Amino acid sequence: MSTETELQVAVKTSAKKDSRKKGQDRSEATLIKRFKGEGVRYKAKLIGIDEVSAARGDKLCQDSMMKLKGVVAGARSKGEHKQKIFLTISFGGIKIFDEKTGALQHHHAVHEISYIAKDITDHRAFGYVCGKEGNHRFVAIKTAQAAEPVILDLRDLFQLIYELKQREELEKKAQKDKQCEQAVYQTILEEDVEDPVYQYIVFEAGHEPIRDPETEENIYQVPTSQKKEGVYDVPKSQPVSAVTQLELFGDMSTPPDITSPPTPATPGDAFLPAPSQTLPGSADVFGSMSFGTAAVPSGYVAMGAVLPSFWGQQPLVQQQIAMGAQPPVAQVIPGAQPIAWGQPGLFPATQQPWPTVAGQFPPAAFMPTQTVMPLPAAMFQGPLTPLATVPGTNDSARSSPQSDKPRQKMGKEMFKDFQMAQPPPVPSRKPDQPSLTCTSEAFSSYFNKVGVAQDTDDCDDFDISQLNLTPVTSTTPSTNSPPTPAPRQSSPSKSSASHVSDPTADDIFEEGFESPSKSEEQEAPDGSQASSTSDPFGEPSGEPSGDNISPQDGS
């Protein structure tokens, strides 16, 4: 027994000396050898384990230590003692074994230990916080010797593990960089690219290497994947959509006019001739015209669709009855040079703006825009046809200085069955205005063959084809004497079969807004008298001659 006791004492003293030497040597190699395998073993007693709310904190650890010591004091009064253990410190963490049985009681890995605290009241006691997030526990241990060497070993272990981890990460990163660099230069050699530096940058960025940097344009060219609708791309042409009345004028307050021809579906159709509805014979006789006019919506005082006319003027037929306006009728100027059918006027037709209130149309809004001379009288020997009843006028009548002379009028018998609003009165003409008298027998015979002139107040274009002309005679043979108006008779007959006006009633549009209370004035045509200031060929001014006669425009 004595020999065994001596051997144990000698081992203890040698272990103490070795621990001191090891404690003094804190090199990395020594620490690795020290904590390798089973590690360092210490004899101690377990005070207890308490659950805490946080992972670290001195006050937290001290409070938990005092609490566990109080529990142990209560158990000692009952005859219970602290459990004897021995703990090992290694790379695997802290392991607690039972001294009697040698069984493993607790094992806490290094990454689970978050805080180590020393008891300020007892130099042989210490504790550490371990556990995962939300499940932290404080382990209190009382060593057989001073607790400082155990705390220092734990500190060295943590520091060594941290340094080894950092070194390992650096080595892995260096190895990865080396592998990447080798792969990059291997790719450069295979692809035979001229710019290896740029190739390296592209490879590191994760893009594909440039295949063909042959020209300088490839460097500044925008990739196809980045081209968008805008700066680098030509904007695509948008298809022309159909234009409707609602799109042009918005929501109309009044229903559209269903009697007028439909609006062209596309902008290109606006220049095509519209279907002939008001002049049945015009399209068949003279063919399709070159220009058409789209209908105006009824919400903006629509006057009906303007059909293409071979006279260059724009007749408004259907809705002018409701608005108090009269259809235009081309004036016949005897003695002038005839103009071919469909020949455009010397002065372009002018589109007058539509008024927004009925009855407020200016007199010049419906002026004829083209002059068409009458055909020879021999063409009218047979029965009247719509072909010879639609002559027009040119702008010479509009530019005549005698525009204030009296106009021809018609009676109201034609519209006695219609209920319409009367147009606003126009100031009466001067009584001293001269009238035009024509003494040409050819012109008189022409009127005998054509028909009778009609009044223009509230006249409708549906009845113009039924008018008859009465012969008028010259009352003044002199070409210098003022003309006298010839009386006109109105025909009460109405017919909707023909919508073509007579050649002598071509100023119906000019006469539509004059007062119905005016006295009828007579006008007799004179084939040898001329008072026009502008001939059909564009001469703005000239002296009266016996070959041309200018129609008189209303004020």
From Swiss-Prot:
From the UniProt record, which GO molecular function terms apply?
A: phosphatidylinositol 3-kinase binding; signaling adaptor activity
**Domain annotation PID: ranges:** 36-189
State the protein's name: Disabled homolog 1
In residue numbers, the region (Disordered) covers 1-26, 386-409, 469-555
Its transmembrane ranges are none
What is the organism of origin for this protein? Rattus norvegicus (Rat)
What are the BP-aspect GO terms? adult walking behavior; astrocyte differentiation; axonogenesis; cell adhesion; cell surface receptor signaling pathway via JAK-STAT; cell-cell adhesion involved in neuronal-glial interactions involved in cerebral cortex radial glia guided migration; cerebellum structural organization; cerebral cortex cell migration
Quaternary state and interactors: Associates with the SH2 domains of SRC, FYN and ABL. Interacts (phosphorylated on tyrosine residues) with CRK and CRKL (via respective SH2 domain). Interacts with SIAH1, LRP8 and VLDLR. Interacts with LRP1. Interacts with APLP1 (via NPXY motif). Interacts with DAB2IP. Interacts with ZSWIM8.
- Gene name, per UniProt, is Dab1
State what this protein does. Answer: Signaling adapter of the reelin-mediated signaling pathway, which regulates the migration and differentiation of postmitotic neurons during brain development. Mediates intracellular transduction of Reelin signaling following reelin (RELN)-binding to its receptor: acts by docking proteins through its phosphotyrosine residues and PID domain.
- PTM (free text): Phosphorylated by FYN on Tyr-198 and Tyr-220 upon reelin induction in embryonic neurons. Also phosphorylated on Ser-491 independently of reelin signaling.
- Phosphotyrosine modified-residue sites: 198, 220, 232
